[in-house]
């Protein structure tokens, strides 16, 4: 290989400048590996969209060069896009046991085989083309999270994945500090590190702190306790179970994703539940309210989640009763604040006692704060640094932290999705771009909804639609019947008869003018109807409904 080829290209396809859809490609010569393949949930204006996944055009164009996919942990923003990726790129997928356990459920739902998934554990070594990878245990808000040591012909890259330094983890499995330090002694060319909490000073509290809060709440609660949390936070679920056992309560689990993760975690040994503690939700009526704990989804106020349906008095099996204690063991993801607030309000209206503030100790982050981030840098001591996993301000703040530790600014690169970051032994910089963006998933459709469709949906949601049906004579364009106007989401027709009659007149005038000018092309006729009617409606209502002309010829 020539000297000009002694470079590694690092290509983030998602996860930079945003929270979610984490995916990064590493390329050396004709070999590509992929780290993570996550999704993100739609923004508020993405009407009707279920999921957002990264654009993998670059990977499809280089499909024959992709050697393997490596997963850092089992959160949706790191594995959620894999069912869509694996349908098109069939390569080995490596992850820890719990990560693959959760993934296999997703693959089954999407009709994708899990035969090419391979379990790894910290300390294992895997070769994939020119890359040799090692794996280190880290703490996060899900068990079995790992960081990656990626050996390349250019040098050693450390990718932290999502991490925090929890000195008292629930499962007793602390971060492998010694491994990071050993790599630091060996010499690390590039560190790629989690930036989510780069703005937060100090240290992220231990997960065990939440367990102490559960103990306090369980001790004094006189009726049922309902705890909403992320289904993937197995350590938190373990602490809920531990408190339930301590205070002689039975545990019921509600919510599809919660039930799935609990079953997988028990099967793989990550969740330890004494026999007889777990009961079906239908059995809760056989016990006193003071003997019951319900673990549920819905900590983000998701409209169809179990807790939201309970709060709306719309759940088939659980009715919120006065005196119930509801603990929301999570903080709202940005954009979900209103949904969570509405759920809390509705729970209070039903007479529940709701515990939800972070200051009450019912939630801690799964990401490193500034002092832990500094410790990671000091353990690894990289030559170059690239902040990852965060919105742009998080990346900038993380870069500033690295500089405060003595990293030269020219040795830091703040990338963006689609940037080709070229790494050599002596330099790092952005050398080009590849396609990167958001692929929208709507039902079974992947990528068939774009900006134009979203624009139409937004217009429909804001001002409604007006359908104009008119029949014209083929040669003269004279009106034979109609125009008839059907309105949905614009005005209630019976209360706006004058407006509708005048609207019909405007359509007639537009078509008469076209006939006078011998215009017979359908596209022109439809455009004339849209323009004339649109101007009139805006003048009268200051609204712009979607206007859909339907012209029939006889």
What residue spans do the PLM features occupy?
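His/Asp/Glu-rich metal-coordinating catalytic cores
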Residues: 2-70, 75-286, 305-319, 338-342
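A glycine- and charged-residue-rich anion-binding loop/surface
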Residues: 16, 40-44, 65-66, 356-359, ...
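Short glycine-rich phosphate-binding loop at a beta-alpha junction
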Residues: 92, 386, 548-549
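Conserved hydrophobic residues forming the short capping helix/wall of the S-adenosyl-L-methionine
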Residues: 107, 402, 537
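Short Gly/Ser/Thr- and Asp/Glu-enriched loop/turn motifs at secondary-structure junctions
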Residues: 121, 416, 543-547
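Hard-cation-handling environments
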Residues: 199-329, 333-358, 362-518, 526-527
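C-terminal tails and terminal domains of large nucleic-acid-associated
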Residues: 518-554
């Amino acid at each position: 290989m020539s000297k000009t080829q002694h470079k590694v290209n690092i290509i983030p396809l998602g996860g930079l400048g945003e929270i979610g859809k984490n995916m990064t490609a590493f390329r050396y010569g004709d070999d590509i590996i992929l780290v993570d393949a996550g999704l993100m949930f739609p923004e508020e204006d993405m009407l009707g969209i279920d999921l957002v996944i990264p654009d993998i055009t670059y990977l499809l164009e280089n499909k024959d060069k992709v050697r393997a996919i490596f997963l850092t942990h089992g959160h949706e923003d790191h594995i959620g896009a894999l069912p869509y990726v694996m349908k098109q790129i069939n390569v080995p997928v490596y992850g820890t046991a719990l990560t693959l356990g959760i993934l296999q459920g997703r693959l089954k739902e999407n009709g994708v085989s899990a035969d090419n998934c391979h379990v790894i554990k910290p300390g294992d070594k895997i070769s994939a083309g020119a890359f040799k990878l090692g794996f280190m245990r880290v703490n996060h808000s899900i068990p079995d999270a790992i960081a990656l040591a990626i050996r390349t012909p250019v040098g050693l890259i450390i990718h932290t994945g999502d991490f925090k330094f929890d000195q008292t983890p629930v499962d007793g499995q602390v971060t492998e500090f010694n491994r990071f330090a050993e790599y630091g002694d060996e010499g690390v060319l590039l560190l790629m590190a989690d930036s989510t909490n780069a703005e937060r000073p100090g240290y992220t509290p231990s997960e065990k702190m939440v367990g102490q809060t559960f103990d306090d709440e369980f001790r004094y609660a006189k009726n049922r306790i309902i705890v909403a949390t992320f289904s993937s936070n197995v350590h938190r679920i373990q602490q809920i179970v531990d408190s339930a056992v301590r205070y002689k309560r039975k545990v019921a689990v509600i919510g599809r994703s919660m039930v799935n993760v609990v079953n997988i975690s028990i099967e793989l040994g990550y969740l330890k539940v004494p026999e007889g503690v777990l009961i079906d939700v239908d059995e809760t009526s056989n016990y006193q309210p003071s003997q019951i704990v319900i673990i549920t989804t819905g900590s983000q106020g998701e409209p169809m989640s179990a807790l939201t349906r309970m709060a709306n008095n719309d759940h088939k099996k659980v009715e919120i009763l006065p005196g119930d204690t509801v603990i929301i063991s999570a903080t709202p993801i940005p954009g979900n604040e209103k949904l969570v607030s509405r759920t809390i309000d509705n729970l209070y209206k039903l007479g529940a006692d709701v515990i939800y503030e972070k200051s009450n100790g019912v939630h801690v982050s799964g990401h490193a704060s500034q002092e832990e981030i500094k410790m990671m840098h000091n353990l690894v001591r990289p030559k170059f640094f690239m902040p990852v996993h965060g919105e742009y301000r998080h990346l900038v703040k993380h870069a500033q932290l690295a500089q405060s530790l003595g990293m030269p600014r020219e040795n830091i690169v703040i990338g963006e999705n689609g940037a080709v970051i070229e790494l050599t032994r002596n330099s790092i910089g952005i050398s080009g771009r590849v396609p990167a963006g958001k692929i929208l998933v709507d039902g079974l459709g992947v990528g068939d909804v774009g900006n134009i469709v979203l624009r139409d949906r937004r217009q429909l949601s804001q001002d409604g639609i007006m359908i104009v049906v008119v029949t014209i004579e083929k040669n003269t364009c004279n009106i034979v019947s109609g125009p008839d106007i059907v309105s949905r989401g614009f005005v209630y027709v019976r209360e706006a008869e004058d407006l509708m009659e005048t609207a019909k007149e405007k359509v007639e005038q537009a078509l008469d003018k076209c006939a006078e000018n011998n215009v017979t092309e359908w596209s022109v006729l439809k455009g004339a109807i849209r323009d004339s009617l649109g101007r009139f409606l805006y003048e009268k209502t200051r609204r712009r409904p979607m206007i859909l002309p339907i012209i029939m010829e006889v």
